[in-house]
């Protein structure tokens, strides 16, 4: 019998302010990788995380 793939999937969170902000501490885009349960959270995930490029806590959204 084949195994079930499971409900947890790997996602990437990207800083929303890095692309539009020109006054950054360093060039680049902050990204975090994490897991989410697709049954409990079917919509896109949004979390406040620390961005080392902006040097502050910003909103990070899920990307594909």
UniProtKB/Swiss-Prot annotation:
Is Ribosomal protein among the key words of this record?
A: yes
Please state where this protein is localized.
Answer: Plastid, Chloroplast
Descriptive protein name: Large ribosomal subunit protein bL33c
Q: Which family does it belong to?
A: Belongs to the bacterial ribosomal protein bL33 family.
Q: Which GO terms describe its cellular component?
A: chloroplast; ribonucleoprotein complex; ribosome
Molecular function GO terms recorded: structural constituent of ribosome
Give the matching PROSITE patterns: RIBOSOMAL_L33
Which GO biological process entries does UniProt record here? translation
Family matches, as InterPro entries: Ribosomal_bL33, Ribosomal_bL33_CS, Ribosomal_bL33_sf, Ribosomal_zn-bd
Gene3D superfamilies xrefs: Ribosomal protein L33 (2.20.28.120)
Highest taxon, organism lineage: Eukaryota
A Pfam family = Ribosomal_L33
Q: What HAMAP family would the database entry show? A: Ribosomal_bL33
Query: Which keywords accompany this UniProt record?
Result: Chloroplast, Plastid, Ribonucleoprotein, Ribosomal protein
Q: Which organism is it from?
A: Phaeodactylum tricornutum (strain CCAP 1055/1)
């Amino acid at each position: 019998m084949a195994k079930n793939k499971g409900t947890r999937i790997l996602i990437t969170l990207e800083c929303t302010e890095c692309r539009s902000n020109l006054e950054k501490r360093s060039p680049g885009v902050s990204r975090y990788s994490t897991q989410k349960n697709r049954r409990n959270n079917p919509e896109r995930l949004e979390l406040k995380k620390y961005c080392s490029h902006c040097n502050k806590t910003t909103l990070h959204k899920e990307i594909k």
